[in-house]
Amino acid sequence: LQSNFVDLGFRLNIISQEENLLSEQFDLTIFGSTIQYDKNFLTGLNSRNLHLGDYVLFTHTPLSLEKPFVSKQFSDYTGLQTIHSFEDVSKVFEKLGYNLIFKSTLPPEGASVEDEYTNKTVYANLLFTKLKN
């Protein structure tokens, strides 16, 4: 029998159903390589703003250095992905009261975009923090 309890030295709840988010407050919200599968991610954030943590982390996320675009993905998933622009993501989070405090890039082949988009794409980690009033 496998235990579901792991002592990390702090409380950890993992919630994967959006309806369960309504009654919770979070320190950290993690989007791990997911936003490219939701073409309306940025426009839908306003309705989810109250449910984002004080910190928002994007990991292994392909972002456009120019305008957003749609590309085929070449990995285990072979469908379409919407590559949101770094500028749009930054602007939306600024409007929501967040500040970008960390960014890093990963090897570009991880973005798995069509060849014509490779030079326009960065595969990134971003960390935003909620500004205090």
Where in the sequence are the language-model features?
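Class I SAM-dependent methyltransferase SAM/SAH-binding core
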Residues: 1-20
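Short, solvent-exposed loop/turn segments at secondary-structure junctions
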Residues: 35-37, 62-64, 106-108, 133
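A short, conserved alpha-helix within the catalytic core of class I
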Residues: 36-51
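Conserved beta-strand signature within the Rossmann-like core of class I S-adenosyl-L-methionine
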Residues: 52-72
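Short alpha-helix
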Residues: 79-106
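Core SAM-dependent methyltransferase catalytic element
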Residues: 105-133
